[in-house]
Structures are given as C-alpha cells and as structure tokens.
Curated annotation (Swiss-Prot):
Protein name: N-succinylarginine dihydrolase
Annotated catalytic residues: E174, H250, C368
GO molecular function: N-succinylarginine dihydrolase activity
Pathway assignment: Amino-acid degradation; L-arginine degradation via AST pathway; L-glutamate and succinate from L-arginine: step 2/5
Keyword Hydrolase set for record: yes
Gene name of the record: astB
E.C. numbers: 3.5.3.23
Function comment: Catalyzes the hydrolysis of N(2)-succinylarginine into N(2)-succinylornithine, ammonia and CO(2).
GO BP annotation list: arginine catabolic process to glutamate; arginine catabolic process to succinate
C-alpha cells in the first residue's frame, strides 16, 4: 500500500488584517495597523497549495473560522443587534474587537497535532485541536477547528478526533507548530518529536523571560497519551528559551523535519546532543541532522526570512525539496545558505520559492499555513474528497474569493457591520463547495 504525507492548508478568511495581536511574533507586531489585502492573501495561499498539488503531493484545504466572532463578543457583555455589538465593541474595547476578527486560523500548523496510524496503538489517525490559550485571538478557535477537522476527516473507521486540552496555561498547546514526525518511510512507525517551551509544574525549570513560552511539556505529554503513542515513539525536547526571547515563538520558526531529516539552527534546542542520541536510538535508522550555525545564518535573519518556517516535502521522485517564502531569496545570507544546502549531500536537493507575503507580514510562512497528515491510500480515500486540491477546486475557490473578498482592509474596517454579512455569506457558500455541513455557529 502507498503512503503519503498530505498537507492541508488553511484558507485565508475574509477578515485577514494586520492588528498586531501576537506578542512575541516580531513580524505580527512590526506590521500592526498596515492595510491588508484579504483577496491577495487568499489567492497567495491557494497558489501555494495548488503548486504542491501540481508537484504530485496530496494537498487539501481547511476552512477558515467565522469572523467577526459575535458569539465571543456577546459572551463578554456586548449586546444588541449584530451591528450594535460590533459598534459597542469598537467604541469600548477595540482590542477585543480586533481579537474577535482575526483570520489567524489560516495558520493550520496551529490547528491541531496529528499522529498517523502507523504510530498509534489503535491504528487510527489521531487529531487533537490545539487550545492556543496563550493568545486571546487564537484561544477562541478550538471548538470550530474541531468541527472543521471532523467534517474533513469524516470517517470513524480511520480517524479519531479528541477534544482540545483543558483551557489553562499549564496545558498551553500550540499544535503541530511544536511537533515533527521523523520516520524512514511515511507508512512505517516513526518517532514523534514534541518540542516545548517550559515545564508548567516546575517553577525552577528553564523558561524564557521576555516572551511567553506557549507550549508546555505537560500539554505535549497529554497529547501523546491521547494519541495512544508508545514511549519508544516519543521524544520530548525543550526549545532554547533564549531563542524564544529573540522572537522564535514556535519551534517551526527554528527547525523543520521530514522523514529522516531534521533541519535546525544550532541555537534551537536545549540538551541537543543527548536528545538527538535518543532520536537515533528510537528511530533505529539513518538520520540527517542538518545544522545551520549562527555564523552561517543569525537568529535575526532566520526569523526575518523564515528560513525554518519552510516546508520540506518528499517529491514523487524521492528527492526532498524545501518550499520557501520569497523572503528567503531576498535575504543575502539565507539565499546563499540555501544555494549551498542543496550541494551538501543531504536528501534535500531542491529549493522552491513562493510568494506568501500577506501571510508573512502577519508572522506566518509556508510551514505555518499547513497541517501535515501522514496517511495510507485507504485513509486518503476516506477523507472528504471535496477538500482535496485539484484543478476544479482551485478554480472554484479562486472564483469564490473574487466574489466575496475585499482587496483592502484596515483595522478600522473591522467595525463595519457589512463585514459580518460578507463573511457569513462567503463561509456559507464555502461549506457547500467543500461539503462540510454546518460547521459554523451561525448555520445552526
């Protein structure tokens, strides 16, 4: 049976804006209050997804969240008609309105953690939505994320869906952005690398001092238990607190893995060699640890270019390719390094560049935009086929974006009641295109 690593990219929602909501994310903060282009953002994301499908990859899409989130605004005390709720929130608590209008669900690396059937005791693919408790604008996502995942991976024979972890800082969980699966082949049992920023139950353990550590060891361990993973298939590794304080808010900003390759910056982790030895022992097959030194690429250049927020994919030919943002081409040190990397004798033989600048300006590169799901042929066939990218879906979704999305949006536009109507009309139509059923509260 054939095995694949599918990528499910988040569709950019109609309210894509630059409100600077993500403390600890340098790009998000530095581009706050700029005018965004939701239509361009959505089309950039679709083009990247279609390009991977054209390379022969299994590529899907995940629907965005309903925004503005009027249910949360009502829950925190704003009342009246929908228009009045928006107006009151804009006047009395604009920061809360901004949080309830974020299109951050486009970054599906934070949607959930996924364990493939080859690793789990019950032989099913397991999904746990991330609770994202560290950021208000993302903490309101998990319930709808779970609905969308269940409508996308909608066969109980093959897929097991869990509730997100308890909504408390001790279980801060940011999903697949802090999780990489290493294996010899996608269909073979692998090693799941869980990376955390702090141990919540040990106040004396190392942790960052400037920016928050969004992932706890306790959360990573809980997900491993839920997913029925054996101890021999898990490694828990701490991210270096110093790089979190330099703007590396998720591990996928400082390392990325695929199959038997882990591409990482030398400052990425604590206790690096001991943990790499554990990975080698548990993998029991050849591993390529591709280290980038500070001399080659500084942390600042890595964060600004998103060198590590790239995707590493295995092409049908068997070669590995890096899917990088065009920002990597524009950074001389990073571009020089990537040109050298393909000559170093690792499995990485190609680099392909894509323009995802609308996402990058909010702090999300190619790796943020996708959720990886390793599956066999039967599991791929059990996925909701309407969510898988092909020429027809690409055309339908581009037409849908043209019909419903604005080409500019400012933070002040978020108080426009028309945005509610536009967004709900768009999402209602999208659920019909993708055959998701009623995943949104306004449809129930």
């Amino acid at each position: 049976m054939k095995h694949f690593e599918a990528n499910f990219d988040g569709l950019v929602g109609p309210t894509h804006n630059y409100a600077g909501l993500s403390f600890g994310n340098v790009a998000s903060f530095s581009n706050a209050a700029q005018t965004s282009n939701p239509k361009a953002a959505a089309k950039q994301g679709l083009q990247k997804a279609k390009s991977l499908a054209d390379l022969g990859m299994v590529q899907g899409v995940l629907a965005p969240q309903e925004r503005p989130d009027l249910y949360t605004l009502r829950r925190i005390g704003f009342s009246g008609s929908d228009a009045e709720v928006l107006q009151k929130a804009a006047q009395q608590a604009p920061a809360l309105l901004n949080a309830c209008c974020s299109a951050s669900s486009m970054w599906t690396a934070n949607a959930a953690t996924v364990s493939p059937s080859a690793d789990t005791r019950d032989g099913k693919v397991h999904f746990t939505p991330a609770n994202l408790v560290d950021k208000l604008h993302r903490s309101i996502e998990p319930v709808t994320t779970g609905n969308i995942l269940q409508a996308t991976f909608n066969n109980d024979r093959y897929f097991k869906h869990h509730q997100h972890l308890p909504e408390h800082a001790s279980f801060g969980d940011e999903g697949a952005a802090n999780h990489t699966r290493l294996c010899s082949e996608y269909g073979h049992a692998g090693v799941e690398l869980f990376v955390y920023g702090q141990t919540a139950t040990n106040p004396d353990a190392p942790k960052p001092t400037k920016y928050p550590a969004r992932q706890t060891l306790e959360a990573s361990q809980a997900v491993a238990r839920l997913h029925q993973l054996e101890d021999e298939s898990c490694v828990f590794m701490q991210q270096n607190p110093n790089v979190i304080d330099q703007g590396v808010f998720h591990n996928d900003v400082i390392s990325v893995g695929n199959k038997n390759v882990l591409f990482y910056h030398e400052q990425a982790f604590l206790d690096t060699e001991t943990k790499f030895d554990e990975i080698r022992r548990k993998m029991n097959s050849d591993m390529y640890f591709v280290k980038v030194t500070t001399e080659q690429v500084s942390i600042d250049d890595a964060v600004r270019s998103y060198l590590f927020n790239t995707q590493i994919i295995t092409l049908p030919s068997g070669e590995m390719a890096i899917i990088a943002p065009t920002n990597c081409q524009e950074n001389p040190a990073v571009f020089a390094y990537l040109n050298e990397l393909v000559t170093l004798g690792t499995p990485i033989k190609q680099v392909r560049y894509y323009d995802v600048k609308q996402s990058m300006q909010n702090g999300g590169g190619p790796a943020c935009l996708r959720l990886r799901v390793a599956m066999n042929e039967q599991e791929v066939a059990a996925v909701n086929q309407n969510t898988l990218m092909d020429d027809g879906l690409f055309t339908r979704l581009n037409t849908w974006v043209d019909r419903h999305y604005r080409d500019q949006l400012t933070v002040s536009d978020l108080a426009d009641p028309q945005l509610i109507i536009e967004s709900r009309t768009a999402l209602d139509e999208l659920t019909q295109i993708l055959k998701l059923g009623s995943v949104y509260l306004f449809q129930r």
